[in-house]
Amino acid sequence: MRKTSLTIQNGRLIDPAHGIDAETDIVLENGKVAFIGKVSKPAGAVFNAAGCIVAPGLIDTHVHLREPGQEAKETIATGAASAVAGGFTTVCCMPNTRPALDTQAQVEFVFKQAAKAGMAHVYPIGAATKGRDGKELSEMGLMAAAGAVGFSDDGTGIASAAVCDQALRYCAMTGKVYMQHCEDHTLGGGAMNAGPLSAKLGLKGWPNIAEDLMIARDIMLSRNQNYACRYHAQHMTTAGGIELLRQGRARYAKDAAALGFDPAEHRLSGEVSPHHLLLTDAGCGAYDTNYKMNPPLRTQADVSALITGVADGTIEVLATDHAPHTAEEKAQSFAQVPFGIIGLEPALALYMKALLWPGVVSWGRLLAMLSWNGAKLVGLQDTKGHLGVGADADVTVIDPDRIWQVDVNAFASRSRNCPFHGWSLKGAVAATVVSGKVKYAPDAGRLTGASPVATTAAGLAQAAQNGSGH
């Protein structure tokens, strides 16, 4: 086999999993991390990371890639290219495709399409119930054997407590995480957050209690099963939900030792998305449909509670909930348009704006929430989420000082539904390395001794669709 080598030099390497934060080099050989330390005479390709952060490849455990069935919005290829443009080397795709991702064949299809694109690694999250209808459990065992890394009915929560109880038990048997879309639909289902503004706009409101009730129920179900299944609350938005998770985790820490668990490795976790950290329901005031999402944007008090939840460790994972829709769909009236926005490409800089620059978290915490913690959540921690020797050679290089403007028309994604268009952000991807190969490097002058790579998101999308991203 022909040896491939890439040395990333002169950067500040931060690997939260191993407690490394140092100016040093890293050598990648044949798709694996081979060496960390100063290299005087590098062999093969060299990337000059001067002034940059060198981090484990970012992992997004919550994206929607729409294939099969809704390819006009996104495909696995364009979504994986969008991930690379945003610095993500691994993504986990949700099962609300058409048909739902609820069979072994569907799981295998995702891997096949991702391999063909040659961009980010894509791992499927299988549907917990057949057709995501919340009634009958799917064939979790077969999907897990085929490579599904978790289960969810995302887009809806499992309404029946009995069915959810079964889902948790079967997830425990497969050793996979259960991810819950926390919404009691009998209370939810509105167009935006319930409050004075929804009443003023004449839009059906969606109260916080719809989210809080399901979180409370699920934590009780989990504890009743002695936390046998790893439970994860998706895209959290409410102050009440954060407090419920905080209390549940504190109770788990007391229960853990007697149950044989490590109190530091929580069996209850949650995630937040960038839009819920930076936007409020006030954005809906002009009926801009790019502010309609599920769960909805909440109040500033809720945003502050989410940020506190990140600061105190209640929230362990950051995930984009990348949800593409066509321009035609988003051109309908606010009440009719589908929920969701795209987020993979601006996410890193948005998290920096919300959490890093204000001092809520350190670089180490931010990167742990974007890599190591996600890897552990979906069981990929042996080879991903860190830069230990022998780990997969997935690396994200970040230029913390670069200021850029969000331009949705330059995205790799097929869709353009993003409320951050025109925002000026500080911090950008300098390179995305997948399996030891530089897939994206906006400043080509930093890379020497290698074949030309994509320098634009559009170039990434083209390569992915042509199958030339390898």
Q: Where do the PLM segments sit?
A:
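Active-site mouth loops of central-metabolism enzymes
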Residues: 61-74, 97, 123-136, 202-208
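C-terminal cap of metal-dependent C-N hydrolases
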Residues: 11, 333-336, 389-456
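Divalent metal-coordination and catalytic microenvironments
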Residues: 11, 26, 31, 51, ...
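Alpha-helix-loop-beta-strand connector modules within alpha/beta enzyme cores
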Residues: 104-121, 169-180, 346, 350
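Histidine-rich, glycine-flanked metal-binding segment
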Residues: 1-56
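Histidine/acidic residue-rich metal-binding segments in metalloenzymes
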Residues: 135-318
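Metal-associated gating/positioning segment near the N- to mid-region
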Residues: 50-117
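His/Asp/Glu-enriched, well-ordered alpha-helical/loop segment
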Residues: 200-228, 290, 311-312, 316-318, ...
